[in-house]
Structures are given as C-alpha cells and as structure tokens.
Amino acid sequence: MRTAIIAALIAVTGTLCMAETTPLAEPGYELAYGESAEFAFTPTGQYGSVRLVYDVRMQFPRAAGSTYVMAWEVNGKPLNAAATRTSVRLLNKPLQFTMASGLEIGWAQGNTWRAVYSPDFELVQGTGAGGMQVEQVDPYRFVIDITDMVTRGEENTITLLHRGRVMDLKRAFPDMDPTLELVFRELAFDLSDEPTAITGLVDDADEFSADRVMLQRPATCDIGGVASVAGSGGLSIRLPDLDLRVSSRFSWEGGGFNGFAADERGAQPEWVVRKDTGDEDGATIVGTARDYRVERTVRFVDDHVAIEDRLVNTTDRDIGLAFDNRLEPVGSEVLQAYLCGNPDPAMVSLRGFENPTVFVRGNEAGCGLVALDDVYRIQAEMYWEDGAGIRSDVFCLPAGGEYTVEWAIYPITRPDYFDFINIVREDLDVNFTIPGQFQFGLPSAADMTPEAIRTMIEERDLAVFSTGTWANTGGDPPYYHGAQSLEAEHLHERFRRACENLRAVAPEVASLIYIHTFINLHEDTPERFPDSLITNADGTPYINPGYTSRIGMPFYYCYPALDNSYFDAMKRLVDLCLDDDEIGADGIYWDEVEMISPKRSYDRWDGYSAELDDEHRIARKFGDPHLLSLDAKVALVEHIRSKGGTLIGNSCPRTRTMQDMHFPRFVETAREWYPARAHLYSPISLGDHKTVSDFDTLLDDIRLKLMWGTVYYYYSRPAHPYPTITRHMFPFTPVELHRGWVLGEERLLTAVPGTFSLGDDDPVTVCWYDADGALADHVGEERVEGGKRLVRLDLAEGEMAVIERR
C-alpha cells in the first residue's frame, strides 16, 4: 500500500575535500505499518561515492529480535546489501551478525533489510536485551553505498516500503496491539570523498528481444579438456577467464582439518595422501588419518566430474568427521555465486533447503557443485567464503563404520546458472510429467452447484482439487493434524460429500485430502506416541512455539519410522482418506514432506549426525527427522500408490531416495528466491499468499515465478474476470528451465520476448496473454529453419505466452 509519499527534492553539491550529509527526512521521522514513502534528491558536483545513511528501529516495548521489514529501491531497482561477491554495499558492518543467543543471521535478504524491535536506540546493544543483544556492531545504523545506482546531476528517487502488512507481523503478537512503525533517528544521504566500494559490476539482466533466438542447450564441455586431478587429491578446473581449485577437508578430533588440495597447516602429522591410480578417465586417491581413511574415486563422465569419498572409521569408537568440498578461484575473479540457486551476493550461507548446489560464474564461464547422496544433502550448508562450497559441520561415523559421500562438479562454458541446472536435472532424471493445475478449496465443493464446479474447473484448467489444513472453524479443537485427524468425523463426512460432488461433475479431476506426517495435535500426544516424539536436547517433547501461541493448542511433532507407532497411525490416515467406504478421495496432498520446523530430535541417533565441539569431538548425537523417517516415507508413498492414489507434496526432495519416487511437489514462495528451491525437481512454485490479493497481483506472481524458471500452482484463489495463462500451463514435462521461460515436451511458457522453438517442426498453437492477463488476438511470426519451427514473440512488458503442440 503506497499511501505515504514524501518528496525530498534536494540538490547538493559535494566536494572532494569533505563529505556532505543531507537529510531525506527530519530526525524522528516515522513510517507507519504497511505504508511506503518516496524521497527524491539530485547529487551534483564532485564526490567519490553516494551513500544512504540511516538509524532505524521498529517501535516495540521491548527487545524482540529483528526481521526483514524494510524494502528499499533506488530509481526503481532493488537495493541489495552487495552488488557482487567482491563488492559489498553495506559499509559500516559485516553482512552477518551474531546475537547473544548465538544465532547468526544476515542484515539483508535481497532488497529486504532488517530492523530491530526496540523502544529506543540503545536497548538492543546492552545486556538488557538478553539473548537479543547485538553487541559487536551497531544494530540501528546502516551506511550503504548506492553510487552506481545514482545519476549525477539528475533527480533520483529512493523508495521504502514497510513490509509489516505483507508479512502480517502483528499476527505474531496476538496478545498485544503493537504499532510497529519504523522510527528513524537519521535518514539521509552522504556525498563522500571516499571512492565507491562498488567495482566489477555484473549485468544479470538478460537482454531479451523478439529477435533473440532462444535455442539454448547447455554449454557443456569435454571434461577431460578442462579438469585434472592433482597428486594432493584435489582437482583443477580451467575454463575461459575462470580457473578454479577444487579442495576438500576433513576434520580430525582434537585439532583442525586434513585435506585434499587444502591448507595443510591444520593437518595431523599422521595425515598421508597417496594417488593410487590415474588416467584420462579419472583417479583413485587415499588419505589416511589417525582415526579414519578417505578413499576417493574420481571419474570423468562426459561433461562432469563424479566423485565418491568413502569415509571409513578405523577406530572402535564413534568419531566426529566434519567435511567440506569447495570451489576456489585461482588468479580469477568470481563475479557471482549462487547458493541453492539464490544469486543474492549478500547471502553467505544457506542450509536446510532442497537445492543442494553452489554455482560460481566469471565473465565467460561458470562451474557448479552438487551434493548427491542422502546424508550429504540433508546436512549440507551451502556457503561463500572467498569461494563457494558445500559442507557438513555435523557428520559423524559409528565405531568401525563407513559411509560414501557422493558429489559432482559441472564446468560450463557459458556463465549461465540455468545451463548447470539443466544438465544436472538430466543426470538426476527429474524431468517427469506434471499432469495438471492444482488448487486448494475442495471442501467448498460440498456446497457448490454442479455449474459452479464446472465453471471453476474450466476457468483454471484444474486437474487436482485438494483440501487444505483440517480447519474446524468455530469448533473445538480449532484444527486437526496428524493422527488426531482420524477423529474428525464431521469433517470426514464433509470431505466425502465434496469428493462425490466433484466426481459427479468432473471425474477427470482428482480429489486430494491433506495429511501432515509430523504435526500431531492430541493434547496427550506424548502418552499416545512415546516412541515417535521429536524431542529437545533435554528430553522434553518439541512443541512449535509460533503455531501453539497462534492456534491456542500444543503443536507436537512426531516422526514416522517403520518400527514406531506413528507410522501405523499415518497408514490408517491414508486408508481413511482413500478407501471407498471412508472419505473415498482420489489421492493425498502431503504437506511439508521434507520441510518442518524442528531440525533435530534427541530421542534416537540416525547414525551420522552429531553436534561437534570446537575440537570436532562428538558433543551430543541426534537424529535428523528426515533421516529418521526416510524409510517410512518411502513405505507410505508405496502404500498410497498401492491403493491407486494420486500424490502431490509440499517441499521438494532433500534426499536422493525421495527424489527417485517421482511425484509432483511444489515449494512455498514466501521469499522471492524460493522458486529456486524447486530447480532440481518438479519446477513448481506455489503462489505467494502474502502478496496475491486480487487478479492483478496474481498475474504479477505468475510472471515472477516464470522469471525464476518455474510453473505455477494456485495458493490464493482471487476471482478471475476471464481465464488466463494457467489454463494452458499443463501437462508439462520439463526439458529446460531458463530465466523468464521454461521449455517442456508439450509446450513452452514465457514471460519475456524472444524467438522460441519446441525443438522440431511440428505445428504449434500460440496463446498470447496481454498485460491484463486476457487472451489476445496475436499469434507471433513463424518460420522453419534447420528442421525447427521458430516462433517470434514480441511480448510487451507484462505480457506472457504459451506455445503448444497441436
């Protein structure tokens, strides 16, 4: 909502002998919850850099942490905390900070910046803030270099949005009525004599045009020509204008790290590396330490390097064994790095997400690294520290045990992240068919007329209609989850009636019932499922604090395992949903398959996870809920399929085992970059319910998801004045993902202009949607060249199109 527009029309002349600070607003300026403001200024004269300077807090009666609540733009472009991996905009403090509680977080994500909850400009820096204290840096003050985003001698604009309403921040404080306005002690810009910190800019904005031919198979290379294995066990990758060293390190108890092509200063005296074999197809390297052995097999496979590290515990005790594999530039500059598909140069670490990759790019080439095996993917932390890598800080091995870590390196002769992703997708065999459009709201079909059901289906080309969470509106309890859902008999009947009504009108549309295999809302959950509880380190049951506070009942978490009682309850829940004499639905919508709030359970060990102390010894073992439940989840998928059930999931796979089950899964998109989490599986983004409020914002969301290389599933369901592009989105069998367009076997969808092809000369139909989302009377220009039908689409801003096989 842009209701607060403030014009600060200022012309300032700076000199090289002194810095000039000019207010954009008066001291004490406040921006109300959910509002936005615009400030205009004109820098003139001689200066070295232009800086946005401010002190800010979000009004709150106590220290309560911080959140990404401010969205800044300069001249309509997002203001991020860094321009490239080597050009940081935030000048007065590091990109990351640590609270007194030990939590390490960043000051910005994309163009959204943190503000601390505080009643004044002192509390958060002092001990009175408790675990929320930020002691090492000033949490209120920000100095940001915007030189490259500003035009000298012309009017420039800075825009600020308070994202509180979009985030629904007040919902987090149900027993209070906080105002949450942003309060500025200072809001100004500096013309400084200091030179700008921004150099080596990367133009990530593709030059889209109708005449650009979008035939872009991945720019692979002959791996033997660019990769070599060193005697130290590491690898060298030599690409145009991008030389990289691939190094690995493995912790040892009581000290530092042993390594392959890594810094040897922290290695054990006993650490010995030998290269057993090596030829044009790869090599075998063995590293021997006091407590373990690393047997590395390197294979050159066409366009990539496949690496297996067999880790063997040679002792009769459990050992900690953190490990790290990374890409380091050697005499080259990495201009951009993607972590989990996120290109934000201010992001230095990500963990717990589904896209276990890092990708670095120079001017002419790029290189990616991907974790492959189950444990590596679950434990992976993707990071940037003068190089990009994937590490595990929690890996351990049982006495006499072993485990094989698998990963791969993909050099690309074009600096294109999507080239890397498309090759990996082929190798992972994840280009399976997404059958059709999905939507929540199935219970409403219990009360809808046949005509209303048919209109809705045709308008959105629905193939799947699903219930959401089992909301018991106005009842007690207010929600049902997990095994507790077996007792919601009145909802069973409503769901059954909805399925029957849908089937009578559109038997081709699948009815799905929501399940969650971790959350359970029985008040006596600990007594019902003592063998299945996710527990805290002190042995108490984990209870989600946010849900518990908001809903008013304890949100316990259990996990299914083949040998525990919760798995049996989940099978009974599936039977209830699918059996003809029960609800009788066509399938299951499985929420949060691999994305839940508790990351650890201390009730049992998964065999490979432990908290390690500063000397890499095991401090406490734990079980990752997704490793503990892995076999049971596979069995549950097989149980659903044995009943003929359709299956769709929320969150993409975080293990190769679940990846190979091949059923459509989407990712939620509360942050702009979240569609990238789906890049290594079914590339489906669920709509952002926080920003989609009407048909226009729905169209914006669909375009945004296409810009991230994904197709679209509905979350919010605003009224449609007419059918739009989602009607022609499925079925979709992915072939290639790109920025702004996606290619499938059946169709191509684009939000950018270009000359496109489905790869052959088959006849096609073009569905062209104007900026208002309506089907337009345009078909593009067609020609056939080299056996390929090319379709020129001169899309204007906001337009989208589909090219379908006839």
Question: Where would I find each of the regions flagged by the language model?
Answer:
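Active-site-proximal substrate-binding groove within the catalytic cores of carbohydrate-active enzymes
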Residues: 397-404, 625-806
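Active-site neighborhood of glycoside hydrolase catalytic domains
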Residues: 565-656
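Asparagine-centered strand-capping/turn motif at beta-strand->loop junctions
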Residues: 43, 162, 311-315, 750, ...
